[in-house]
Amino acid sequence: MSVLDLARAELRGIRPYVPGAYEPGMIRLNANESPWRSPGDTSDRGLNVYPPPRPTVLQVKLAEYYGIEQKQILVTRGSSEAIDVLIRGFCAAGKDKILICPPTFDMYRLYASIQNAGIVRVPLLAARDFALDVDDILKALDANTKIVFVCSPNNPTGQSMARPDIERICRETAGRALVVIDEAYHEYATGGHYLDLRNRYEHVVLLRTLSKFVSLAGVRCGLIVGAPQLIEFAQVVLPPYTFPTPSIELVEQALSQDSLRVSEERVATIKRERERLAAALRDVPQVMKVFPSDANFIMVKTRDGQAFRETARRAGILVRTFEDPLLADCVRITIGRPTDNDQLLRAVAGVERASNA
């Protein structure tokens, strides 16, 4: 069975859009573009011409960086667009479903709702630091469950999922559903990644992003990593020309050796600060528990989440609370610069001293 047998039947025969030919050095009179640059255009390639249908130069660089083949990569506008592309490609509206494990990244639910796809929820096991409930995940699958989303490290709880659990899900869903492993935070993890699974299981897809690691959240660059035939199919769903020229050039710069060296040093700093902040928060009376984290944030259980959030806000710091009952009084704290983290700790400690005076 091919992974494409899981895709929407009505999309399988559609051919991708074929753009006009582009040859460097040739005069472009075949694409109805302006022959002049816009005033203030300082880009290398020129913003008066369309970007390439696919940012091939980035696919080459990313494939080299991750040690995979170019045909296994599709660049998207952030990993959120990748989620949308996969749901639209595999879930027929009003018929098919996705499976998610809340509390988790809410974009899975949002894009499924927009597509009118069903949503099966198998909650993480809160008593086990939000581990996957693999038995219930497998029991919940039926013929219309087309995608299983697993976020590792998980947002917003922060922990990496146990590799044996993920491998079991991949093994037992073969031929039944696509497994999408969202690795948006994998650079901050200590337990490795799941790139090796793409060759062992045709139905396994990985999501990556450059928003965190190389500090390009404003550029919106994500990618789908999967079997070549799945990537070819996803290109039917993703329109051409979606990745802008300025974004291509910024990502190229970020993937240079010098820039990557800086990014890797910053990741090391975040990891050190994560441990320091976690240790300090354990001594704060408001904090009941600091959850283990493999991401660039920490989640804590507090006595009063709203009060903790307002304490931080009065000190000029924004932290995140959640409406999900599973996360009652939990607060997600992004790891900032050392001075940012110090400011948060001073604010929380100061309020505690005042309340205990």
Where are these regions (language model features)?
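N-terminal "arm"/small-domain region of PLP-dependent enzymes with the aminotransferase-like
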Residues: M1-E64
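Phosphate-binding glycine-rich loop
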Residues: P55-K97, Q115, T302
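PLP-dependent aminotransferase-like
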Residues: Q72, G89-V150
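Active-site pre-lysine segment of PLP-dependent enzymes
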Residues: S113, A131-N144, P156-L216
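PLP-dependent enzyme catalytic core of the Aspartate aminotransferase-like
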Residues: P164, T311-A315, R320, D324-A357
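PLP-dependent aminotransferase class I/II
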Residues: H203-D283, K289-V290
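Conserved PLP-binding catalytic core of the aspartate aminotransferase-like
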Residues: I270-K271, L281-A315, V331
